[in-house]
Every structure is written in structure tokens, then in C-alpha cells.
Design a protein with these regions (language model features):
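Bacterial Sec-dependent N-terminal signal peptides
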Residues: 1-26, 520
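A short helix->beta-strand "capping" segment at the edge of beta-propeller domains
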Residues: 19-43, 80-86, 312-325
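Repeated scaffold domains used in trafficking and secretory/extracellular systems
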Residues: 40-48, 93-103, 139-153, 188-198, ...
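Short beta-strand elements that form the blades of beta-propeller/WD-repeat-like
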Residues: 47-48, 53-68, 104-117, 148-149, ...
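Beta-propeller blade signature
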Residues: 72-80, 122-130, 171-174, 217-230, ...
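Blade-loop segments of beta-propeller domains
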Residues: 81-120, 134-147, 233-241, 404-408
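Conserved blade-ending motifs and adjacent loop-strand segments that build the rim/top face
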Residues: 234-246, 289-326, 400-419, 448-480
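Loop/turn-rich, solvent-exposed surfaces of beta-rich toroidal or solenoidal domains
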Residues: 331-358, 369-391, 412-449
Length: 520
């Protein structure tokens, strides 16, 4: 194995903002630490695996040839101060590629395909925080799987996806090293929406969308032990007229489980509101449905005059005893539990298309406008408009709701962009775009600090950002009230850093916040 050679710049606590035109910056966001990894080749790709208070594992895919074939992958373990704990190199076959990664109770897992032409041959590498040694687990699923989920719970790895277009869930115990298919999933009627792991009870919940006999759709939630033994199977009854499009679930705690998602009467692409469900020991207690028009701030991301016009239409409809209907595509996040409340997050988006003959052909209200263009449609990506945050109590009554405008983000696959965190009664919403941490602080239905734009801080006083890769940047939760931003940047410094006036780096900035501070 060839010794790894790279330049690692560990940045001190004092970091400096980039030069940019004046915009409102947040008074509550702090960026105390930063680390940079210099990119020697454009082909390098970085993956970050947050491990709570154990730090972050940074994985770099390179095109550097290994001593006995294959390519080098560089790994760096950093602690919560973004100081390097260890660095290492491993060689992967040239046909192998990374599928997913996971962290659970001090262990970091990387899931790879050994051969891109044989999806049933997998390999998992397990790393610990304190040393670069790793364990290897070779897994053969017998049949090819299109993997969509990779999780870990206790001594068990969870692999889920589709085999022959049907859902399948596999458990793999790292002690006996035997893969087992979890029964009850290989059915054409179901689609896997998500998998939720409870670290404390070491249970996992699989959320499925299921087609009913009346051709409507509902949600089924199955909870298992880490061995794959089922302990609860909940099927939501949405009534005769509604379809449930998606769902997020709380962890299974003492027989109590909540579900939240979106619903519609006809379309499977557009939702008309939210639903909240409560289960106790497998018995559905109730469903509560809320139209978008019933929320206080759902349209708060719009310009004031437009919001006022929409609210007037809602009130006119309400005066006649009816509810105004709105259609949105929403990407639902996981449910957060804090201080006796349950917080649901969703991001509104719409697909954008271009036409070879007539150009753009899309609707800013959330969808493609048919019949207005010519030629073959060319998919440009998903455009995000705003995030919705709502809190509900144990009886599924909505306590408050807020919105957060999203600008400039477009992705080719649906991705969660907005991160929600908080302390006390205050909640902060953040996303990273164009090298800015865009944020908003709310306290229930009140806005504490409006939208702000805090530049990602650079390492040296004379640093100047030249370009950044829009496809490689984001914010992730880390531990407690700490997050981190990451991305790729081209930086210029006339004074020079390590003998260079320009450098291309992959960076991680530690982000903390003080919500007790008064806004600017």
C-alpha cells in the first residue's frame, strides 16, 4: 500500500468572513472552527459521515492507482474541534463504488458494491473513532437489489431496496455474518418510504405506502426488533376519499407512535394538506387532516401583496363555509421530538423542464403546465420554493406553524435542504446556498430574526472566494445544538498560504448558535 501524501490545513478558531456585498447577517450564528482538505484532482469526491460527539469521518474518493490495482480512498477522522484524530488509505476495486454510509454508537460504516455489474455482491467497512483499523464484512444477497436505504441498529445492519421492482428488507448481524430477508415486504402493492431507527430501544420501523382495494393509497408502518422480529404492524385508515402520499414516523416508544405526512383526494403528485395520526399498541386512535388554507403562516414566504390576496380568497371561501384548496408537491422530513411537542418539516418543490422548440415550460405554482410547449421535454431539476414547519401536541392539534423561503436551489434528485434545530421555545431554520448560511429564527408563530445571509467564513484574513461547486455544499446536524457546513471552494489569497496564492479545497465549518441573543 502506497503511503498517502496530501496537504491538510487545520484552521485555528479565528476565521474570517469572505468579502461580499452587505446583506443582513445573523446575530445568533457562530462559526468557531474550520478545516480544509486540499483537492489535488478535480475527480476527487468527498463524503461526510457525522458521528455525533465522536466526530466526523471524511471519505475521499480518488483516481490514484493502488499498488496492486484498484483506486485509493483516503479517510480522515476529525473530532468535535475539527482536529484530525487519524488519517488512513484503503484500496478498493476499480469497479467498486460507494452506496451509503451510517453511524451507530461509536461505529462508522461504509457500504460499497464490489462490482458495479453485480449488485448482489456488497462489502461493508467498519471504523472506530480512535484508530484507523477497520473490519470488513462481505455480504451476498443472492439476488440483485437496487439499494435505497442503509441503516444500523445494535449489532445489525439494515439494507432495503427493490428486487425485481418489489420491496425487500435484509438484516445482517455483524457477529454471525448471515444475511436474512425480513418477511412481509415482497409485495407489488408496497413502496418503501423510509426507515426509522430507535437507538435506545434498538428497534427499527419501516414506513410503506400501500395501495388499497379502492385504488386509493395509505401508509403502513411495521416495527421490528434488531433481529427482524415484528412487534407491531400499523395500517392507517384514511377513509374512503383520501390518499396518503407519504409519511414520517416517531420512534416506537412504549407502544406509542405518531405519523405525519401529506394527503390528497385524487393526485399522487400533489398534496392538499397534512395529516396527523396517533397509534397506541397498534390501535389507531384518530386521524386529523389539515388543509394548507387552515395554517396561519403557510403562505408567509410570499411577497406581502400576494400573500394578502391569497388570504382574502381563503377568507371569502371560509365565509361560505368552505375551505380553499391548494395543491403542492412536498418532501417530508423526519419528525423531531422536543419538549413535549412534535415538529414536522416539509419542503415545497416543483419539477422544471425545458423544451427544444419553445424553451421553458413550467408553472411556478408547483408543476408542469401541459399543452403549452413543443418538442421533447428536457428535465432541468427540482426547484424548491419554501419549507413548512409545524408543531403538534400529543393529541395531534397543531400548536404553531411557520414557513421559510428557499431561493436558488435546484437539484436533479429530491434532497432535504433545510435543517431545523433549536433550544427552549425558539427554533432556527437554515440552509446553505451560494456560500451563504441562510437562516430564520422563530418562536412559535412569532418571527424573532427574519431571513439572514451569513457568509461561510474562510480561513485567513486575505482569503477571497473565487468560485464554489453548487452541487457540493450543504448543512447537516452534528451533535446537541451543533451543525456543520461543507462544500468545495476555489480561494485566492494574494499573501499566499503554504506557498500558494490559490487553492481548491473541500471544507467543513462548525456551526453553533445562541438563540438567547437579540437579533440585529
Amino acid at each position: 500500500m502506497r503511503k498517502i501524501t496530501f496537504i491538510l490545513l487545520v484552521i485555528p478558531i479565528i476565521v474570517f468572513p469572505q468579502r461580499k456585498k452587505d446583506r443582513d447577517t445573523s446575530a445568533v450564528i457562530l462559526q468557531p472552527n474550520r478545516i480544509e482538505f486540499e483537492k489535488n484532482r478535480d475527480a476527487s469526491e468527498f463524503y461526510v459521515v457525522p458521528g455525533g460527539a465522536d466526530g466526523i469521518l471524511i471519505v475521499e474518493e480518488t483516481l490514484e492507482a493502488g499498488s496492486f490495482g484498484g483506486y485509493e480512498w483516503k479517510l480522515h477522522m476529525v473530532d468535535t474541534a475539527l482536529q484530525v484524530v487519524w488519517s488512513s488509505t484503503m484500496i478498493l476495486p476499480s469497479d467498486g463504488y460507494i452506496i451509503g454510509y451510517e453511524y451507530f454508537e461509536g461505529r462508522f460504516y461504509l457500504l460499497f458494491n464490489k462490482d458495479r455489474y453485480r449488485s448482489e455482491d456488497l462489502i461493508v467497512y467498519q471504523f472506530d473513532r480512535d484508530r484507523p483499523d477497520f473490519r470488513t464484512y462481505e455480504i451476498t444477497t443472492v439476488f440483485p437489489i437496487d439499494i435505497t436505504h442503509f441503516e444500523s441498529v445494535g449489532e445489525t445492519l439494515l439494507i432495503a431496496g427493490y428486487a425485481n421492482f418489489r420491496p425487500v428488507v435484509i438484516t445482517y448481524n455483524i457477529n454471525d455474518r448471515i444475511p436474512r430477508v425480513v418477511p412481509g415486504f415482497y409485495d407489488n402493492k408496497n413502496d418503501i418510504l423510509d426507515i426509522v431507527v430507535d437507538e435506545h430501544s434498538q428497534l427499527f420501523t419501516v414506513i410503506l405506502q400501500e395501495r388499497m382495494k379502492n385504488k386509493k393509497y395509505t401508509v403502513r408502518v411495521k416495527t421490528f426488533t434488531s433481529k427482524g422480529d415484528i412487534i407491531q404492524d400499523n395500517l392507517v385508515n384514511p377513509g374512503e376519499k383520501k390518499s396518503l402520499l407519504d409519511a414520517a414516523s416517531t420512534t416506537f416508544a412504549g407502544g406509542l407512535q405518531y405519523l405525519a405526512g401529506t394527503h390528497s383526494r385524487k393526485s399522487l403528485q400533489y398534496s392538499q394538506g397534512f395529516y396527523l395520526s396517533k397509534f397506541i399498541n397498534g390501535q389507531q386512535q384518530f386521524n386529523k387532516f389539515y388543509a394548507f388554507a387552515e395554517l396561519n403562516n403557510f403562505f408567509g414566504h410570499m411577497k406581502p401583496k400576494r400573500e394578502e390576496r391569497i388570504m382574502n380568497r381563503i377568507e371569502k371561501k371560509r365565509a361560505r363555509g368552505k375551505t380553499k384548496k391548494f395543491n403542492y408537491r412536498l418532501l417530508v422530513h423526519k419528525i423531531l421530538e422536543r419538549d413535549g411537542e412534535y415538529i414536522m418539516i416539509a419542503e415545497a418543490y416543483y419539477p422544471r423542464y425545458n423544451y427544444s422548440a419553445t424553451g421553458s415550460n413550467f408553472s411556478s405554482f408547483g408543476g408542469y403546465a401541459p399543452g403549452t410547449g413543443r418538442g421533447n421535454p428536457y428535465f432541468l431539476g427540482y426547484k424548491y420554493t419554501h419549507a413548512v414547519v409545524l408543531a403538534f401536541d400529543p393529541n395531534c392539534n397543531i400548536l404553531w406553524d411557520q414557513t421559510f423561503k428557499i431561493e436558488d436551489i435546484q437539484t436533479y434528485s429530491l434532497e432535504e435542504n433545510v435543517v431545523v434545530s433549536g433550544s427552549g421555545d425558539r427554533v432556527i431554520l437554515m440552509y446553505l446556498e451560494e456560500n451563504e448560511i441562510r437562516s430564520k429564527v422563530v418562536e412559535r408563530n412569532e418571527i424573532v430574526e427574519g431571513r439572514t445571509f451569513s457568509p461561510v467564513k474562510l480561513s485567513h484574513e486575505n482569503d477571497e472566494l473565487k468560485t464554489r461547486d453548487p452541487g457540493v455544499e450543504g448543512i447537516k446536524k452534528w451533535y446537541d445544538e451543533t451543525l456543520f457546513a461543507y462544500g468545495e471552494q476555489n480561494i485566492k489569497n494574494p499573501s499566499g498560504v503554504a506557498g500558494k496564492t490559490t487553492r481548491k479545497v473541500f471544507y467543513i465549518n462548525k456551526i453553533q448558535y445562541d438563540l438567547d441573543k437579540q437579533p440585529n
